[in-house]
Amino acid sequence: MTKIGVQASTVVDAFKEIGPYETFKKLNEIGYKSVEVSQVETSEENIDQIIRACKDFDMEVAAMSAAVEPMFPGQESLDTDFDKIVADCKAVGTDLLRIGMLPFDKMASLEKAIEFAKKANKFAIKLKEEGIKLYYHNHHVEFVRYDGKYLLDIIAENAPELGFELDVHWVQRGGENPVNILKKYAGKVELVHLKDYEVMPLTMEDLGFLQTDMEAFRLAFDNRVRFAPLGQGSLPLKECADQAIASGCRYLLVEQDSSYGRDPFKELKISYDWLVENGYGDLF
């Protein structure tokens, strides 16, 4: 059965300021019971707090996160910390592990992206022996075409053991229909990120650039898309959620990459209310 949860990175500042235990408590008070852990330091203390929070608030960890190789000095990765990452997954009780993004140096080279996919596939096979499934989270760059093929499809071809965590906002930003991509990868998608796609109106300040700085106006005009709580934008979210469920998704995870100065917990409450109002309340 599909469950609805939340992506920890949405409230990453809270994890740093009040710790995992109190952050899980606040998420639970909204109504979220499943949390995908990402951008949270996996220190022994934090892992212990997560375990305790899950027990005290009847919550669960939907998935953990890992890089294939370090993207910055000191970052844990499957390359350098395989045993610890496996141990952390088992400690918090999840069998799902996800790669958050394509490393930056792989984004400008098809050859390097293919090397990454093959390396991820080897780790997917190795993790499978530990009872853990590995997934890859997309952004818009996976919809660059190489000889007519999306990079996402090329990654899939070179990493058959790697599942996908499809992000409906980033699929839309990449120029594709999220419903179609969810349908295309049915059976390969057990994690889905839900966030809305909001186009913001121009401001009077933006219009003022018409008289003083045309380049600044064009920059403002071309960059109107923002992340938004569910129901606040233009994505066909009900169709996305229904197709994700039909495609075998285990967790629909609410995420908002930025709250633009607003309280992210209030943003998550807006998304929670939209999901309940649209018939998904029994999935929490």
Residue ranges and their predicted role:
Residues G74-F164, R173, K184, F265-K266:
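Active-site acidic/histidine proton-transfer and metal-coordination neighborhood
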Residues L127-A228, S234:
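Acidic/histidine-rich catalytic cores of soluble enzymes
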Residues Q232-I245:
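A short, acidic, amphipathic alpha-helical segment used as a generic capping/interface helix at domain edges
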Residues M1-D95, I132, G163, D273-F284:
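N-terminal pre-domain/capping segments
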Residues E36, A63, R98, Y135, ...:
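Conserved beta-strand positions in the central sheet of alpha/beta enzyme cores
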Residues A8, Q39, V68, M101, ...:
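Residues that line or immediately flank small-molecule/substrate-binding pockets and catalytic motifs
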